[in-house]
């Protein structure tokens, strides 16, 4: 064999120097054609790709004629054409014999994915060639994903039918999309309207209000900030409330609408801006600071509270100052909001807290909290005035109560004018009870005494001098009474003691004491019956003061002003 003929094609374009037996033993044919010709796939060997084990290459088919630049084939060499497979016969043969069909790469991959179990089964026929399928391991998953996404409906149905029939080789697992580690553009919360801040890790709630259009923006609507929250569920709840306020109960919420029945009733009396402001106040802090008030941030160095208001001087924020407390900074923001935005401004506190007229008429900012200070002064004056009114009302009530209470309390000085005959009476039909009954013996109704308040004051003034004389004359008896009071302190309260079987009455002029005695011969138990009388010198006859009869309670008058004690 000539050593120069190892190329399998003649070097001379006109004369062939190859012997005839080389042409018959050649199993492959390298045909170089145009770009639009059928190009073999570079991932497989030529012999493995184009061999039809069943002799499917049509004998009468013509191979497309192309320009033969190197002069490999001649028109008379028909014995070499049996190794070529016509283009039309490739599509008519079984798809399992070929891995890549000409230039249509994607449908072949689909067929490969659907017939994967058949590709690895060996044909045990000895005289037939084995169909060999090669694939890249690193690109198998990607090819399966492409096949799943790009397959036509007809091919998808064919894949489903082949996967159901060929169950012996194993089921085909559907390729799932691979998630990358980068979370950019993906949702950071399972709840609607909730996002997780990538730096702070806190959850923020936003609502897209598409009812307005901002200047300079092509997209309709604006983003409404609903506050920052430590828990994801709280942020989702804030979104639900804002969505119910904006779009009504027909909107989609994270939680059932039945959880917000109370809030739905409250939001009916508020506008959208007011309700959003109330939601933000209830949040655990805004994104720019840990303040619950609008427009208030905390300084990162000295910890004081700063107030700012945005979009009043162009697109920049207006600095309002630094304050010692969070509430003062919130008030400064409210004043600036009222100044720039009028009565429709969203404030931290109620707008009636401020002097709106003074704020709107002012030409300087910051107002320095002057409106708030003036309001605080007015509130202080109002509270002091109300306090004085309450004190005066309480003093008048105390005086009236003391005057009305003197009718039953013997320690009052007004009782010097009235002889109080007291008696302990016990109804005979209730003698088995041990509670004595204390009554006032009065000819008229006791309500008349309450009506005669002015009369008592007049009588007190008229008999002031006589009372002083009486006290001087009875000074020697007061020592005796004081000594007895020290040994019996219970009598200072004017009560009747059943345990001691004694009763007493205390007045400014003296005290009367009586011992227990029996009433009637049929009484089973003893009970005290005491009458005490201390008569003032009468001013004409035996008639007492205030409708009281002084003659009923004593066996005889006591002009000396000394008490008379006796037992009946």
UniProtKB/Swiss-Prot annotation:
Keywords from the UniProt entry: Activator, Auxin signaling pathway, Developmental protein, DNA-binding, Ethylene signaling pathway, Nucleus, Repeat, Transcription, Transcription regulation
UniProt xrefs under PROSITE patterns: AP2_ERF
Tissue: Expressed in roots, seedlings, flowers, and siliques. Also detected at low levels in leaves. In roots, specifically detected in the distal root meristem, including the QC. This tissue specificity is regulated by auxin gradient and depends on PIN proteins.
PTM: Stabilized in root meristems by reactive oxygen species (ROS) mediated oxidative post-translational modification triggered by RGF1 hormone peptide in a RITF1-dependent manner.
GO cellular component: nucleus
Induction note: By auxin accumulation.
Protein name per UniProt: AP2-like ethylene-responsive transcription factor PLT2
Organism the protein comes from: Arabidopsis thaliana
Gene that this polypeptide is encoded by: PLT2
């Amino acid at each position: 064999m000539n050593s120069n003929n190892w190329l399998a094609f003649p070097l001379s374009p006109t004369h062939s120097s190859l012997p005839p037996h080389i042409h018959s033993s050649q199993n492959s044919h390298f045909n170089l054609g145009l770009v639009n010709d059928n190009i073999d796939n570079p991932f497989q060997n030529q012999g493995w790709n184009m061999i039809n084990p069943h002799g499917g290459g049509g004998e009468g088919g013509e191979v497309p004629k192309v320009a033969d630049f190197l002069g490999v084939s001649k028109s008379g060499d028909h014995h070499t054409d049996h190794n070529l497979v016509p283009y039309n016969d490739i599509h008519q043969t079984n798809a399992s014999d070929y891995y890549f069909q000409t230039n249509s790469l994607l449908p072949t991959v689909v067929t490969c994915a659907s017939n994967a179990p058949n590709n690895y089964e060996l044909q045990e026929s000895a005289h037939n060639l084995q169909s060999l399928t090669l694939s890249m391991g690193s690109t198998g998953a990607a090819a399966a994903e492409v096949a799943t996404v790009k397959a036509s409906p007809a091919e998808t149905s064919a894949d489903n039918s082949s996967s159901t029939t060929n169950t012996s080789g194993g089921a085909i697992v559907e390729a799932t999309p691979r998630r990358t580690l980068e979370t950019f553009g993906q949702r950071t919360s399972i709840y609607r309207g909730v996002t997780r801040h990538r730096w702070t890790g806190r959850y923020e709630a936003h609502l897209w209000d598409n009812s307005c259009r901002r200047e300079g923006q092509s997209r309709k609507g604006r983003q409404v900030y609903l506050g920052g929250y430590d828990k994801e569920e709280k942020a989702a709840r804030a979104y639900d409330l804002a969505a119910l306020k904006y779009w009504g109960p027909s909107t989609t919420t994270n939680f059932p609408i039945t959880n917000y029945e109370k809030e739905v009733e409250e939001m009916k009396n508020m506008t959208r801006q007011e309700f959003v402001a109330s939601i933000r106040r209830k949040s655990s802090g805004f994104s720019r600071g840990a303040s619950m008030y609008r427009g208030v941030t905390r300084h990162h160095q000295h910890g004081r509270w700063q107030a700012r208001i945005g979009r009043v001087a162009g697109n920049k924020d207006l600095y309002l100052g630094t304050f010692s407390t969070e509430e003062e900074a919130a008030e400064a923001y409210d004043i600036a909001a009222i100044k720039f935005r009028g009565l429709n401004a969203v404030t931290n506190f109620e707008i009636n807290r401020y002097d709106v007229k003074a704020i709107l008429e002012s030409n300087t900012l910051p107002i320095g909290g002057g409106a708030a200070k003036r309001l605080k002064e007015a509130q202080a004056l109002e509270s002091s005035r109300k306090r004085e009114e309450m004190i005066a009302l309480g003093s008048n009530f105390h005086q009236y109560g003391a005057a009305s209470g003197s009718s039953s309390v013997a320690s009052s000085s007004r009782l010097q004018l009235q002889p109080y005959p007291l008696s302990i009476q016990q109804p005979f039909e209730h003698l088995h009870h041990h509670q004595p009954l204390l009554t006032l013996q009065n000819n008229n109704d006791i309500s008349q005494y309450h009506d005669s308040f002015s009369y008592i004051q007049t009588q007190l003034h008229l008999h002031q001098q006589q009372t002083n004389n009486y006290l001087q004359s009875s000074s020697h008896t007061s020592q005796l009474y004081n000594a007895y009071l020290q040994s019996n302190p219970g009598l200072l309260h004017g009560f009747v003691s059943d345990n001691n079987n004694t009763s007493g009455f205390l007045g400014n002029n003296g005290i009367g004491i009586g011992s227990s005695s029996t009433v009637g011969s049929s009484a089973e138990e003893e009970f005290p019956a005491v009458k005490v009388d201390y008569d003032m010198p009468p001013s004409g006859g035996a008639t007492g003061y205030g409708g009281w009869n002084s003659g009923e309670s004593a066996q005889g008058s006591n002009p000396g002003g000394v008490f008379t004690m006796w037992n009946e």
